[in-house]
A protein has these predicted regions:
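N-terminal accessory segment detector
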Residues: 1-134, 148-358, 362, 372-419
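Extended, Lys/Arg-enriched charged tracts that mediate electrostatic binding to polyanionic substrates
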Residues: 136-144
């Protein structure tokens, strides 16, 4: 089989990444767990788990089909081995898949969702439902691709989960019903909606830091558990299609059944961006690698926002730029598009309101952390600190004034004082 490294592609100008033709980006376990919980809260545990599994199956099917074609994996054995290798390399843990075209079983060890949930919450809480919807969908997709079956032909159910204090994660696979393919959200779909990038403030500095961080990320690999642990978090290379289907279908579901609750769901989706910036960006800013490359954070607002924009670019979130910055008053972030934009346009058409939930929440977190975290004291960015920071509400608010998904020339989010 061919070299997997050659299956990575990046739009350097726009800071968007692809693997096997599928849009990908880096996210941490705090974001992953928060988003999954938001979906379950919005839809209910049963329907939320179904959506999470189906979104994973769909996005993983596209990934694995692209990779199998790219590296020349032709037989079921080769394709199952490829799926197991890719899953671990992306930081999701290890899968042992034993299937035929009619179904089978799989066993997971150190699965990203179940393991990180146990690490974060397991000492205090026993989970009542399985946590690994993503792994379940991935196993189903791996089986479909291995045997050349159409999407939907295999269903997977997690029958045991370490987050429920079982000894291992186990999955049962059985025949399903093929589903109608949806519009592809791939390299071609992304290219079709690209907008020219525009230089922002401190552009050269942001880009220099982003390139340095990209070089560093290129040296990071999964450990023997199939996990990537760094910057105080578990990091995954993840599928943008998974995140986007969860977010936008949850909003659509609530809008149809309980429209008055849409603002609540949208606020939680924005908070997922806030959670990511607090834990992942904060962990990077406090890391020895960052200190060696950029210098330890000092609490300088301008330097903080410059660093955060560089991190966003390196992680594959898009070409985030600073259009305006007045410390203690106002921040304007812009991007030609984000990883959310192509999906919304392909699957939901033009948006009627700001749809870049992650960009909105992240922008708020940029200013919250810049103004409220004592960086010189090298704080521990724990859940307790996060709760204490936001216990009395946010000091900053976001308004998305422009959105490529609405037909505008760029995405723009304005962050101002909330109180």
């Amino acid at each position: 089989m061919g070299d997997l490294a050659k299956q990575h592609r990046r739009f350097d100008e726009h800071h968007l990444a692809f693997f096997g033709g599928a849009p990908v980006l880096y996210h941490c376990h705090h974001f992953n767990l928060f988003l999954d919980q938001t979906i379950d809260d919005a839809l209910g545990a049963e329907q939320g788990a179904r959506l999470r599994t189906e979104a994973a199956r769909e996005s993983a099917h596209a990934l694995l089909a692209g990779l199998a074609a790219g590296v020349g994996a032709e037989t079921p054995v080769e394709r199952i081995a490829l799926a197991q290798q890719v899953f671990a390399a992306m930081g999701h843990g290890h899968l042992a898949i034993d299937v035929a075209d009619g179904g089978g079983e799989a066993r997971g060890t150190y699965l990203h969702y179940g393991h990180s949930w146990s690490e974060k919450y397991g000492r205090a809480v026993k989970r009542r439902t399985p946590a690994d919807g993503f792994a379940a969908g991935f196993v189903a997709a791996a089986t479909e691709v291995a045997f050349g079956l159409p999407l939907g032909s295999v269903r997977a159910r997690e029958s045991a989960c370490v987050a429920m204090r079982d000894d291992a994660c186990r999955f049962v696979l059985e025949r399903g019903e093929p589903v109608e393919p949806r519009p592809a959200v791939d390299i071609a779909a992304t290219e079709a909606v690209l907008r020219p990038s525009e230089p922002g403030l401190h552009e050269e500095r942001i880009e220099t830091i982003a390139r340095g961080l990209l070089d560093y990320l290129g040296t990071v690999a999964a450990d023997e558990r199939g996990l990537v642990q760094g910057f105080g978090v578990f990091v995954t290379l993840h599928l943008a299609g998974y995140y986007n289907r969860l977010s936008y279908e949850a909003v659509a579901h609530v809008r149809e059944r309980a429209p008055g609750l849409v603002p609540v769901v949208e606020a939680l989706l924005r908070e997922s961006g806030q959670v990511c910036v607090f834990h992942t960006f904060g962990g990077i800013l406090l890391s020895p690698e960052w200190e060696g490359m950029v210098g330890a954070p000092t609490g300088d607002v301008e330097a903080h926002v410059i660093g955060c924009c560089a991190i966003a670019r390196a992680l594959g979130f898009g070409r985030w730029s600073i259009a305006e910055l007045e410390p203690d008053r106002r921040l304007v972030l812009r991007a030609p598009l984000t990883y959310e934009t192509p999906y919304h346009l392909a699957r939901h058409g033009q948006a009627t309101s700001g749809s870049s939930y992650f960009l909105q929440g992240a922008g708020v977190a940029f200013m919250e952390l810049a103004h409220r975290v004592p960086w010189r004291d090298e704080p521990k960015l724990s859940d307790a600190f996060y709760r204490s920071l936001f216990a009395k509400g946010q000091s900053w608010k976001a308004e998305q004034t422009l959105d490529t998904a609405k037909g505008d020339e760029r995405c723009e989010v304005v962050i101002t004082r909330a109180r």
